[in-house]
Amino acid sequence: MEGIIICIKLGVVFLGTLFTWIFGAWDMPIVTLLVFIFLDYLTGVIKGCKSKELCSNIGLRGITKKGLILVVLLVAVMLDRLLDNGAWMFRTLIAYFYIMNEGISILENCAALGVPIPEFLRQALKQLNNKNNIK
């Protein structure tokens, strides 16, 4: 049993090190983005269960979308490394962009589940949705 626990710990350390090597430091934008990605997927699954629209294809599309967000983030990291100025400029901008998108989706999912959303957040959502629908 102790050997299994050690293997799990080593796996977690390996994944954390790999993630840090790929995406850079675990600063607040990265941590926030990862938390928002998880919360968006979780609230989406809960919403799908409640509306009885949950299926594996929709779940796979959601996981794929989340994975592609990390691909875009990796492109930004590589651009920052190419510039070699010691700052995470592109990575931080991309993280903020997806934090906003994931945050909006979390609020929409919560609203669909009947959670009251403060009016100022509702108005912000409406404005952002209107801007996104204009092509």
Curated annotation (Swiss-Prot):
InterPro entries: Phage_holin_4_1 (IPR006480). The chain crosses the membrane at residues 4-24, 26-46, 68-88, 93-113. GO terms for cellular component: plasma membrane. Keywords: Cell membrane, Membrane, Transmembrane, Transmembrane helix. Belongs to the bacteriophage holin family. Cp-1 holin subfamily. It is found in: Cell membrane. This is Uncharacterized protein CPE0383. It holds the Pfam family Phage_holin_4_1. The keyword Membrane applies. It is a multi-pass membrane protein.
